[in-house]
């Protein structure tokens, strides 16, 4: 009896690991990962954008169970510009919100965003995502572990001073 999880929203600066997290979720759950590039949904022809988003969501439901990764969701799903684009942005946004609220198939949504202030409040309402997580840049200890994992295959080059690498990569 527990309800199916709907999805999560991952917030953080570019390069902090949001996309990798989306890929890891699908891999861990052994489910296909579908990437929805919001920027490619929008077309100049009247009605094309709305049709593109409906087709993308139908594809995800046909493949379900799966993970639908919506990368940089704020770039295409804002309520701004509804007048300038003939309302296309608003209609695409509405289509996605309705689908997120009413979908019946097990499609887990992992949306990523760089700026929470760019997101429409409707997207953050209860019922759209199960959780919203902020992913920060790695701490020195986390950077040390990342280097240790990725440089292990280069042990023959004698990279031994991981502490120096960690200290030289603040802000990364």
Tell what function each PLM region has.
Residues 1-167:
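Walker A/P-loop NTP-binding motif of AAA+ ATPase domains
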Residues 170:
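A glycine-rich beta-turn/hairpin centered on an aromatic-Pro dipeptide
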